[in-house]
């Protein structure tokens, strides 16, 4: 089964996750969310499964330049619509692998997900 990793190639955390997957021989597909934004239904699934707080990247440049109204919408309103319109706000990387859905990168978590 091929894992899917969503993010942007310039993100250090995404780079670490991609490197780890490659070094451990894990078959994976990388999706650059700026070039191929996931559909709203998929983003909604992520938000519903993991929560808005975990999906919104408050360290991103996009977040820092957003109006207070847009930030409020991202936190308590239609988070999925805001992430769809601003894919660089998606906390990254997002990992999908079978029943696994996770955001961020942790060697311990990835080791558990891909026990060989």
Task: Kindly give the residue locations of the regions a language model identified.
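Local sequence-structure signature of Cys/Sec-based thiol-disulfide redox active-site neighborhoods
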Residues: 1-24, 28-36
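Thiol/selenol-based redox catalytic cores and closely related redox-interacting motifs
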Residues: 33-116
């Amino acid at each position: 089964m091929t894992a899917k990793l969503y993010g942007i190639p310039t993100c250090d955390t995404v780079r670490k996750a991609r490197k780890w997957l490659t070094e451990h021989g894990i078959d994976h597909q990388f999706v650059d969310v700026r070039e191929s934004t996931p559909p709203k239904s998929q983003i909604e699934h992520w938000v519903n499964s993991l929560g808005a707080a975990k999906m919104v990247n408050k360290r991103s440049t996009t977040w820092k330049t957003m109006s207070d109204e847009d930030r409020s919408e991202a936190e308590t309103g239609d988070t999925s619509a805001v992430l769809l319109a601003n894919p660089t706000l998606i906390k990254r990387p997002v990992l999908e692998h079978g029943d696994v859905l996770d955001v961020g990168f942790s060697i311990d978590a990835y080791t558990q997900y891909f026990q060989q």
